[in-house]
Amino acid sequence: MKNTLKKLLKGINGIKNIPEIPISGISTNSALIKPGNLYIAIKGNRYDGNKFIPEAINNGASAVITEYDYSNKLSTPIIKVTNSRKAVSRAAAEYYDHPTKKMSVVGITGTNGKTSTASLLTSILKSAGKKTAQIGTLGIIAQGLSKEKGLTTPDSITLHQNLSELYNDGYTHIVMEASSHALDQYRVNDIDFNYTVFTNLYPEHLDYHGTIEKYFEAKTKLFTSYPNSTAAVINIDNEYGKIISNRCTVPIINTSMISNTDISFLDNKISIDGIYGTIKAGKISYNIKSSMIGTFNAENILCATAVSKVMGINKKAIEDGISLCNTIPGRMETFSLYSGATAIVDYAHTPDAYTKVLSTIKELMIDSEANIYVVFGCGGNRDKSKRSIMGAIVEQFATHSFITPDNPRNEKISVINQEIINGFKKNNFDVFLDREKGLKTALNKAVKNDIVIALGKGREDYQEMNDELIPYSDINIINEYSHEN
């Protein structure tokens, strides 16, 4: 069906007499508008798209959508809507013919565990013979389609374009991370989620949401705004999971590591060698064998098992998929050093994730007398209140700490570092303005059985500084160090 302005805005309340204008593309970036395109003006935190309406029209926009009254002396139609972000979502879904209506889509949200749960579920679905793509922090993981990492959840236009490409390439299943920003900004408003998953919630992104309550409300949308979903899987070991379970508007499956609920990890052994045990789901028992480590990963395995079961995946495929899902990029990735020490890279960047990762390493260390060296930092232009908290958490577990930049963005590195230092009670740390130097110092210090853990960046291959992406990789530095020695 030919894309027209009337078709793209179908179903948006309050709009009447929409002209049948052909539309050849959609963009929220006026500089990218080509003749025949629809321009949708978005008022963002840094830029107001309404100021660029004249540029969009000069570039040939066939129509413009805005939330404001706009005086236009030209013939270009200006359509006023109550919410431009919702309009982008609807227009993008219509333009690309609602690809998620034709696929099975799982949406996963939570402060921590989204990527690991998504990777586990993707592995399970592939073991069951389902052509599955994964969308999230790691980018788009799909055979034959390579997309760079960007936002955890892409903007609405990019998202529906990617989903359309995946559908046309024969993909039947999509596993998608849904960030709080995406939910708050209506980026996934017109995604047809068949199943949803809640991993956990802890204070994070308060620089954006303002309060933990608003952050929670954004996450809750995934469980209250999609009434056509088949089921929701909820980790009720987290206090916010219990609240969501009570609010959810679709059938729920509760998971727990500690209580006998819908799906539970009845007996488990978590060691440096992996996670083993039995997950009980009604009359079915799943034998779990995973090389992943940590209680937090056992929770992720539980969520992935639960949603797989409700999707109708067979027992063998679930067990095989979990067993085959080994190291997840940037999540507890380990590297052996020539000194006999071990380096670990993890994406952890919240207080809760720090606690879980560091406590797991401390608990599972072979040599209790060995040293733990932690290389870390905090992001600039983000929630400042957590910086001293994260410093205090690191001090609790580390023999020595190396405070370094981690995407300082437009803040001074020295200011961020000082706010981290405020959480320390002792002077068992060194401070660096260059992360590479800090990481190499830690690697040189480590001897047999010691652990060097670099937190925050995971598989990121850049430092975000002063509106630029500067090439940088913890993993490359560790690999180069190993080869040099």
Model segments located where?
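Phosphate-binding loop of NTP-binding sites
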Residues: 7-12, 87-236, 240-248, 281, ...
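Short secondary-structure boundary segments
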Residues: 66-69, 178, 200, 236, ...
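ATP-dependent carboxylate-amine ligase
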Residues: 1-14, 32-38, 51, 249, ...
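A short acidic, helix-capping loop that chelates divalent metal ions and anchors anionic groups
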Residues: 72, 141-146, 204-209, 382, ...
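Short internal beta-strands
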Residues: 62-68, 232-236, 375-376, 400-407
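Short acidic/polar active-site loop segments enriched in Thr and Asp
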Residues: 62-63, 172, 194, 399
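Acidic, Mg2+-coordinating active-site environments of NTP-dependent enzymes
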Residues: 7, 11, 70-75, 184, ...
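N-terminal leader/targeting and accessory segments in enzymes
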Residues: 1-90, 94, 231, 239, ...
